[in-house]
Swiss-Prot record:
Keywords: Cytoplasm, Nucleus. It is found in: Cytoplasm; Nucleus. Residues 1-14, 154-175 have a biased composition (Polar residues). Transmembrane segments: none annotated. Disulfide bonds: none annotated. It comes from the Eukaryota. One of its GO terms (cellular component) is nucleus. The lineage of its organism: Eukaryota, Fungi, Dikarya, Ascomycota, Taphrinomycotina. This is Uncharacterized protein C186.04c.
Length: 175
């Protein structure tokens, strides 16, 4: 009989493996796992991975909230005067929106997010762009810029002050 062969006794759940060379039982893999579970502290960090429930993101228990969301997504919000208005939607989003053009792919988080602006914000942006297209816009922007203003102490020779400061630093470093 070979003395180095291992014999497993199927007597209990925590089975031990006997080695022919020694009389001491060796712990099986199952008992080793149980031992490591006992040694681990109860508040040990555990990993758990779950995927988000994307189906229920746009569902509300409140029917009014659900109706408001559907109106918002359709661009039919009502203000205090109860007149429907449409939201401004970024043209890039319109181009990538799959509901309007079925042959286009749906935009994803890897692409640009939609920019939905209120009508008042759109009017302000258009007013700014109209004001900047005036023929004197370059002159207006230069007169209002901080570069063309006088120095902090009221003198207009800020360029000379910077040149003098740079030359003083270089002169001191040569010494």
């Amino acid at each position: 009989m070979n003395t180095s062969s291992r014999i497993q006794l199927p007597s209990s759940n925590d089975a031990h493996v006997y080695d022919g060379r020694s009389n001491e039982p060796k712990a099986s893999k199952r008992s080793y796992v149980n031992l490591t579970r006992q040694m681990r502290p109860k508040d040990a960090l555990k990993m758990n991975i779950s995927s988000p429930n994307l189906k229920d993101l746009s569902k509300f228990a409140d029917p009014d909230a659900q109706q408001w969301l559907e109106g918002y997504l359709a661009g039919k919000l009502e203000d205090n005067s109860k007149t429907p208005r449409s939201n401004f939607v970024d043209p890039l989003y319109e181009e990538l929106n799959a509901r309007r053009k079925p042959n286009k792919p749906v935009w994803s988080l890897s692409g640009p997010l939609p920019h939905v602006l209120g009508n008042s914000v759109v009017e302000k942006l258009e007013a700014r762009s109209r004001a900047s297209s005036v023929s004197n816009s370059r002159l207006n922007s230069r007169t209002n810029s901080s570069v063309s203003l006088k120095g902090m102490d009221g003198s207009s020779s800020w360029k000379n002050k910077i040149k003098n400061a740079v030359s003083n630093v270089t002169d001191q470093s040569k010494r």
